[in-house]
């Protein structure tokens, strides 16, 4: 959320074919819930393209990068590193400390995609568990970002959007930005 030091999300590992949807959702969740950028492994080409496309259509700012240097990204990070793992300290025990640190330092959130090596646990400033139960890494990322931003990410605006969702009790209403608020809603299924 551009008003604080940077928050970046690093997807650590990607198995093409098996992880495509989950890796894409890590990027979409990072964008929607306030991170400034996502870094994907170099082999996550389709996920990177999809998240860039969504950012182009629904606005940013949000950057998408690919890297072959996952470990170097962690080691060279200029701020603090938070590794999300079900084995870590309970989120509710450390979220205040992480939030306070984020006022001064950028945060790199590491989200595993396959077995994460012990080096990542050692390099992290915090290994954080959201419930310490097995569940989706996307759910863990969403809860963590909401705690980090204290819910402010839910009110953020998006710049340079081509399309915008109009919240409604029932149905789907997506407008082209140049048409303004009076544009006809998108057909069912559009904008998914």
UniProtKB/Swiss-Prot annotation:
GO MF terms, alphabetically ordered: tRNA (cytidine(56)-2'-O)-methyltransferase activity
Residues the record lists as binding S-adenosyl-L-methionine: 84, 112-116
Record's keyword terms, sorted: Cytoplasm, Methyltransferase, S-adenosyl-L-methionine, Transferase, tRNA processing
Catalytic activity: cytidine(56) in tRNA + S-adenosyl-L-methionine = 2'-O-methylcytidine(56) in tRNA + S-adenosyl-L-homocysteine + H(+)
Annotated disulfide bonds: none
SUPFAM superfamilies tied to this protein: alpha/beta knot
A GO biological-process term: tRNA nucleoside ribose methylation
Enzyme class per UniProt: transferase
Family classification: Belongs to the aTrm56 family.
Cited NCBIfam families: PRK03958.1
Role played: Specifically catalyzes the AdoMet-dependent 2'-O-ribose methylation of cytidine at position 56 in tRNAs.
Subunit composition and interactions: Homodimer.
PANTHER family named among the record's database cross-references: TRNA (CYTIDINE(56)-2'-O)-METHYLTRANSFERASE
Record's protein name: tRNA (cytidine(56)-2'-O)-methyltransferase
Top-level taxonomy: Archaea, Methanobacteriati, Methanobacteriota, Stenosarchaea group, Halobacteria
């Amino acid at each position: 959320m551009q008003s604080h030091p940077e928050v970046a999300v690093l997807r650590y590992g990607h198995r093409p074919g098996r992880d495509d949807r989950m890796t894409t959702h890590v990027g979409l969740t990072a964008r929607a819930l306030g991170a400034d950028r996502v870094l994907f492994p170099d082999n996550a080409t389709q996920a990177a393209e999809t998240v860039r496309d969504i950012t182009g259509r629904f606005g940013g700012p949000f950057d998408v990068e690919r890297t072959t240097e996952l470990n170097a990204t962690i080691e060279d990070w200029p701020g603090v590193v938070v590794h999300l793992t079900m084995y870590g300290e309970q989120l509710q025990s450390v979220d205040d400390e992480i939030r306070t640190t984020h006022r001064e330092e950028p945060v790199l959130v590491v989200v595993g995609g396959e077995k994460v090596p012990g080096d990542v646990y050692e390099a992290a400033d915090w290994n954080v568990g959201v419930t310490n139960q097995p569940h989706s890494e996307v759910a863990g990322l969403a809860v963590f970002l909401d705690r980090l931003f204290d819910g402010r990410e839910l009110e953020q605006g998006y710049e340079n959007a081509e399309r915008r969702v109009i919240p409604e009790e029932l149905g789907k209403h997506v407008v082209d930005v140049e048409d303004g608020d009076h544009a006809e809603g998108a057909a069912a299924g559009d904008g998914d």
